[in-house]
Amino acid sequence: MSTFLLEIGLEEVPAHLVTSSESQLVARTKEFLAAHRLTVGDIKPFSTPRRLALQLCDVAEESEALSEEKRGPSVERAKDENGEWSKAAQGFARGQGATPEAFEERDGYVWLTKHTTGVPANQILSQIGEEVVSQMKFTTYMKWANHSFLYVRPIRWLVALLDEQVINFNVLDIATGRVTRGHRFLSTEHVTISDAQAYEETLQSAYVLADAENRKAQIKSQLETIANRNHWVLSLDNAPAQDLLEEVNNIVEWPTAFSGSFDQKYLEVPDEVLITSMREHQRFFYVRDTTGKLLPHFLSVRNGDTAHLDNVIAGNEKVLVARLEDAEFFYREDQQKKIADYMAKVKTLVFHEKIGTVYEHMQRVGLLAEKLADALDFDDDKKTDLARAAEIYKFDLMTGMVGEFDELQGVMGEHYARLFGENERVATAIREHYMPTSANGNIAKSDVGAVLAIADKLDAIVTFFAANLIPSGSNDPYGLRRAATGVVRTLTTKHWHIALQPVLAEFMAATGTVTASADLMAVLSFVVDRVRKLALDDDIRQDIVSAGTDNFATADIVYLTDRIQVLANHAHDNNFREVISALTRVARLAEKTPVSLNVNPQLFENETEKALYAATSELQLVALEANGAEALYQALAALQMPISAYFDATMVNVDNEQIKNNRYAQLNIINQLIAGLGNLEDIVIK
């Protein structure tokens, strides 16, 4: 078995595109191999800032031979009245590259067996340039020279080897060969690869660690070694550290870790500022002592060896200190003003030209937060703190620190609020109102912060809808889907049952023209769509998600989420099919008549009507006392047998109008309760 090597040599690829490009190369190669029926063993990917590559191990000598049976016209159409092959038969044979003499007659049709012989591997692999390399798609492109061809970065060289043999093809004017490039500074410019299997070893001798996972492991090991030697605590398990490790891994080919320091005086600045300066701006890893206190040291990685490392450390320290000087200055200067001073400036800050200022947005948020607090029965202390938080929660946008480090908005608001004498609940809410900051980010823990976060996001959704700035397709420039997801996740995490429909209706009526033109049902549907998306992401069946969200009534997000989960949990019950069949039969019949809930037991004609009536009366009591969708499902499931018996013995559409309407009224009562679980007709019975 042979080994194939493909390497695409590039100018430096942005760090955030390297890993996804490597994955895409593997995926497209798998599709290519499947399309050409060429079997291989393992596929080993490689990537650095300057190259995307892969090795195909155990490549078959040729593609799999293929025999396909093709059915032609019927025997009757295949021959004319003289028994000769018809034009239809001859055309079919010609289209398959055969003659009618190769026909077989079977099952009333003529058949051809088409044999495709295997194609040598080197012949197939010569097409990988056109079918894989040239077809790669990226979120960022460049053009170079006079080519109209677009790629993530200009291609500078190509290597394609099947064992020792060069597989010839071109991409633009770049021909494949066996010459790669080593490290830009530590190696000679051109490095020859003798054999496809020698790729990784050859590059390592040229100061390139091509295996991204191996390179990352080495970086992690080097960082931990330095931290342990100095008795520092280095945390690499949290998401930001993992992201930084991935970024650093994708900007180096030969990693060498080192440590640096800064003056202890800068530790007077909040930790978040120092960490942001180190991690976000300089790609440094911060360290703490065993008590959790931030230390005046950092760890970093250079793309090179240990030569002149002292100069590298000094240069990095100098750049960091310049950042910290700015941070210290802004931190000191910001405290010279009061919150009222910053709020005066917020009044001039534009939220959106079609909507108004940030200050006006805050006023609406305060009103909506008050209505949400009423719905949640907040006590007076919480309401007071919520009102104060809503009054000032964007003040830090006008501080010098947030102007310099915009990713610290909310974080600095919390710090400054404490320094300016605001209580803990208000200060915490200022930071938490941005949460969650990502699809899977943390939810606000405090009740005041969570309500402020919900109100802030809902006002944005309503006002942007009113301004007809509604997301379409994948286009969502104002992050409204993310905001709606945050609303859903906050409500479900806190398990807050809030009927959004009446709350938002009252809010929109009170806030006038800026929200009046918003379509309330469109807004609610938009938020409920996020419930659907989150449920589908949890691998819940599409039909169950649809059933649970189609009828969202007052838009109690927690109840919608609960009933989706309840239906999903019971979908594996032995009697689920029977329960859903019985309930949907009731629903379909009830939909055919105007709703009437006046049932006269005196008009019952058989025992099954009486039994169903008694069971339904019990169900109504259970539904009134039920604490969630689970109790309602259990109560409705208990009706399955009475419903089945009822339909076995009872004809609903009888001639007697009085009896017929009485029976429909009984079904309508049950259907109103069924609607509490959603539109069960959406469920596919398996």
UniProtKB/Swiss-Prot annotation:
InterPro entries: Gly-tRNA-synth_bsu (IPR015944), Gly-tRNA-synth_heterodimer (IPR006194). It comes from the Bacteria. Disulfide bonds: none annotated. GO terms for molecular function: ATP binding; glycine-tRNA ligase activity. It is an enzyme of class 6 (ligase). This is Glycine--tRNA ligase beta subunit. Belongs to the class-II aminoacyl-tRNA synthetase family.
